[in-house]
């Protein structure tokens, strides 16, 4: 129940759908949480901010990836909120591009890493720090 996602450390659970046969469900929930529970109002962050944990979750999720288990260098991919972002990393620049991004297009149709279509919704920490390009193609229909 998304409405119960008002507690500290609970919002990340939507990324766990990537380990099921229904990752599109998590993408829909992520969109709902980021659109409704994070605003620029005084009470715009759900639950307890806990020294930045909730903000960090939002920033990473809005970029389209999140490390569910600290210490394990794997990131799960989800519904990005940005159209474009870049990060300076050890290997140069890691660029995130999101095509067809809109309020209606909240589902991932395809993801490419450095031009290669991914067959999974996971990337490694090494993929990020080497630099390169992560490209999301979004759609308004769940990809089942």
Q: What is each PLM-predicted segment?
A:
Residues 10-144:
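Non-catalytic C-terminal accessory modules of carbohydrate-active enzymes
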């Amino acid at each position: 129940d998304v409405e119960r996602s008002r507690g500290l450390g609970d919002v990340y659970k939507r990324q766990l759908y990537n380990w099921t046969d229904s990752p599109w469900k998590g993408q829909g929930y992520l969109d709902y949480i980021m659109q409704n529970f994070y605003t620029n109002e005084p009470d715009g962050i759900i639950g307890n901010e806990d020294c930045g944990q909730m903000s960090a979750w939002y920033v990473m999720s809005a970029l389209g990836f999140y490390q569910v288990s600290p210490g394990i260098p794997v990131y799960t991919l989800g519904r990005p909120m940005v159209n474009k972002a870049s990060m300076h990393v050890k290997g140069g620049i890691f660029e995130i591009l999101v095509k067809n991004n809109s309020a209606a297009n909240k589902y991932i149709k395809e993801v490419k890493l450095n031009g290669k279509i991914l067959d999974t919704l996971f990337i490694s920490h090494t993929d990020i720090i080497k630099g390169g390009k992560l490209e999301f193609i979004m759609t308004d229909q769940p990809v089942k």
